[in-house]
Amino acid sequence: MMATTEQHPTLERATFKHSVNILIVVAPYYKDIAEQLVEGAKAEIEASGATWEVTDVPGALEVPTAIAIAHCHTNFDGYVALGCVIRGETTHYDTVCNDSSRALQLLGLQGVCLGNGILTVENSSQAEARADVDGQNKGGGAAAAALHLIKLKQKWSKPTGKIGFLSQVENKLV
């Protein structure tokens, strides 16, 4: 089955007043695909004025674990998960796709700003179409998602202007 070229609406590119640093975590099992995904992610991050660092992990199942470790022990503002899983002859494909996606979603629900660019496809042609920087550019899309979540987190994390003492009467910040 061919990948469609249908266009979807996109949000305006996120930009930042202060420095933003992104960790790109990539499973380079399919090296050519991974390189395209990383290229797209780097370009989007740089276009937003942010900086990036790349780290490799053995496979798609290790991507969420690496992000969780980095989130606990570093000061990255957000994360981009990249990799590719192509269906094979066994059910391993389903396990890797479902578990990596679920783990990334759980991280997001805990407030980790991340974009999921782990491709889950039937064949290499689909992967190439989605990874191509001049095509569907899913690496760039995953980076854009992470950047938008960082922007949203910054918006909702603004100081209220109050000094932080609790009123004993109302039990509210004053």
Model features per residue range: what roles?
Residues 55-81, 87-91, 95, 105-110:
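N-terminal small/polar loop signature for handling phosphorylated ligands or for N-terminal nucleophile
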Residues 28-29, 57-60, 84-85, 118-124:
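Short, ordered loop/turn segments at secondary-structure junctions
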Residues 1-21, 158-174:
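SAM-dependent methyltransferases
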Residues 94-121, 125:
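Short, acidic/small-residue loops that bind anionic groups at enzyme active sites
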Residues 136-169:
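A charged, well-structured terminal subsegment
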Residues 31, 46-50, 68-72, 105, ...:
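Generic secondary-structure signature for well-ordered alpha-helical cores
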Residues 122-136, 167:
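Phosphate-binding/catalytic loops
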Residues 11-57:
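Glycine-rich phosphate/diphosphate-binding loop of Rossmann-like nucleotide-binding domains
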